[in-house]
Each structure stands twice: as C-alpha cells, then as structure tokens.
Amino acid sequence: MITYNKHIKLLAWLVASVAMLLPSSVLAQDENTQSQDEKLNTFTIDAELMTRGELRYGGLPDSEDDINNKASFILERTRLGLDYERTFIKAHITGQHSAVWGQAGKGSFNLYEAWVQLTSRQGLFAKIGRQVLSYDDERSIGSNDWAMAATSHGLLKIGYEGGAHKVHAMFAYNQNSESVNGGTVYRNGDKPYKFMQNLWYHYQHPRVPFGASLLFMNIGIQSELDNYVNKTHYQQLVGTYLSYKPSNWSAEGSFYYQFGRNEYDMEISAWMASVKASYSPTRQWQLVGGYDILSGDPFFAVPPGGGIGLGLVHHKTIKGFSPVYGSHHKFYGAMDFFYLSTYYNGFTPGLQNYYLGVNFKPINKLRFDVAYHYLAIATNTKYLDKTLGHELEFSAVYTPIKEISLMLGYSFMHGSKTMEELKRVDTNGNLHWAWLNVIVRPRFLQVKW
C-alpha cells in the first residue's frame, strides 16, 4: 500500500524534476522560433451550446411501486472556452453551465477545464490543472461527454510523445477543503477517489496501421461507512487495447483486469474483454459487429460491516467488473441501463453485449446509424435467466456547417423478466427512448500577435 506521505513526496519530486527538465529546452525553442516569425501568440474564444430533448417510457423508476415510469425533459449545456498558445506553452480555461429547462435554482456551474501545459522540443511535456482525459476507445478513461456534466480531473500529467511512442503518467490527489482541522479523510467529494495514479503507453507503427496501448491505474478510495474512516483502500486496473485499421476494414480489441481492494476492504478480482470489427464495402456503407463481456458476481455482495445488499451471501471477493471513469454511453447500448445506472440493490452480475450495426452516409454532411444489441448477464444465478433483452437503435446526424450539428435518435428495448427483476423496469418489457440534440460551436475571436 502506498502511504499518504509517500504520495506527497513522490508528487513533489515529480514536479521538481519536470521544472528542472523543461525550462532550458522550451526557452531555447521559443528564442529560435521568434527570430523567424514574430506572431508567436494565439488567443481564441469559443463556445459550445448544446440543447437536448428526451422522451422516455419505461425508464428507471425511483421505487419498486413506480414501475410504469415516463419522463420528458429538455437539457441544456453551455461552455465558454479561452485558449492561449505560444511556441512552448498552452493554457486553456472552460466554464460550464448545465441545467434542465424549468429547473428551480440556477442549475450547475463549474470550471470544467483549467490547465497549463509546457512542452519541450524533445517531446517532453508537463500539464497541470483540471483537464479532460481521453485514452484509446475511452472504455476505461474518457470524457463521458454525453452526460451533461461530463468528466474532468484535477491532476498533474507528465509524459513524452515522439515518433511512434507516447508515454503519459498522471497523478491526482483530492481533498474536501483546505482546512487543517478536517484531517485527510476524503468523502462525498467531487470525485469518487482520493488518490489516482495512471500510466499509459501507446505505440503506433509508422508504416503499418497497427496500434497498441498499455494502461495501469492505481485508485485509492475512502469508504463512506464510519467503520472505515481514516482508511484508504487501493484497487488497480491493468490492461491493453489493440487496433488494426487498414483502408476499408478495421479490427480492435481490449482486455482489462481489476484487482486490489474496494472501499469496504473487500478483495477484487474482475475482468472484461471486447472485440470489434468493421468493414466498408463502399464509401457510403459500413458494417459493424462486436462482443463485450464484463465479469460479474452470482450473488449480491455484502461488505464485512453490512449496510448494503440483500444479505443473501457474504462475498470475500468481488468479481463484478467496474469500467471506472470511461465514456459509458458509447458502449453496452445507447439507453444507458448498464454502468451509467446500477442494478437493483447494488447487484453486479456482469454483462454480455453482442451487437451488429450498419452505418450509411449518403453525403458528407449526413449519416444514418442502425444497431442491434443482445444483452445478457455474464454469470449463472440460481433464480434468473441470463437474457436481459434486445435493443434496437436508430440515429441520424446532420452537419450543415462545421459549427452546427443536428442529431436525433430512437431506441427500443424488449426486456426480459431478468431485466424487470434487476433493473425494476416496466412490467410489459417494452422500453422506449427518443431524443433530439442540437449543438452549436461558434468561434467568437481568434487573434495572433
């Protein structure tokens, strides 16, 4: 286990090392560039205005008695971004407001991004502040941009990018406030973790369309239960992502394994795997197919101190995989019944997702997508069939100009008795979701000097 003092010492050493390593090379780079071009500075102001209306029938109820659930609402998200760039330095700030039309109060306003990055001629860089993380297919670390609040992290990132190689190391430490009287316990904060360290390596062959990534994550979480105050439990994730993308077809796959201990000091041993292939017979058509499997538990998990679960079986090992901080809406069906929302009473039976899709692009500005998902739990249970349901998805995207995107979609799921039992959805098994999304990305100003 990595202690609190070791975390602070390691972080201080890294900051000092980067500070000594970067300045001489970046200053020399800036001086050489200045002699050739006087306009070294670029300042940009842009925005993103997103409005999305949704209609749900048979969604996620608040209680067992509210099975037949309907909802319709309009969401809005507004971002204003300031960007500064010079030869060796970049800085970016994004303010974000999100709300439901008619919502009492002022909605949610936060500083979504606020970071500065120094880069050297040799490919070394350091980036510190609140920033968006997006790696590989975003299955484990992503922006989660479909959610109105999206996801960003306050951390230090250092790395190297050159030739066919990229290496990124990330270090995060979270606290509730700056008060020394509050101790070092971190609960109910902006992020679920107190400590996080990630190491990512990517290799892209310069002449062959093959890429490979390795990812390691170490996450320290403190429990909300009083029995576990002042204890930080660490869980790890390690895995790989591979892709091969020649001209008209592609194949990609990933495997991740989780281990360590969760916030209730329970052992973790979980895994997930995915494969995906696509083929484009013409420029207008693309066929897509794939399979995801995420390990699960055959029974409800109960922590040593109790407090959650049905109490049916006491687990010593958690086998239900958690996709941690990925962009979950991209996977496992567009209706977001899995991993963006939990199973009933915290059950984690895992998931299998078989899918097929067709994409049609009649013109450059217009695209239609159709997909089918067969969804099932991954474990054998004594009282439930594996099948969760069948989901059909239809969507269209129209981009009349680069600043404007119009999107709409409709999804239908026929859920099984297992779906009804685990997700408490509509008893007739038929679930509907329709949405319309409008995104405008204007650029107000860009100046160079």
What is each PLM-predicted segment?
Residues 23-24:
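N-terminal signal peptide c-region/cleavage motif recognized by signal peptidases
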Residues 28-129, 156-160, 206, 234, ...:
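Beta-barrel outer-membrane channel/assembly domains of diderm bacteria
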Residues 57-64, 102-109, 138-145, 179-188, ...:
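Outer-membrane beta-barrel translocator domains and adjoining extracellular loop/strand segments
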Residues 148-156, 192-197:
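Acidic, His- and aromatic-enriched active-site or binding-groove loops in soluble protein domains
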Residues 166-255:
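Internal metal/ion-chelating core segments
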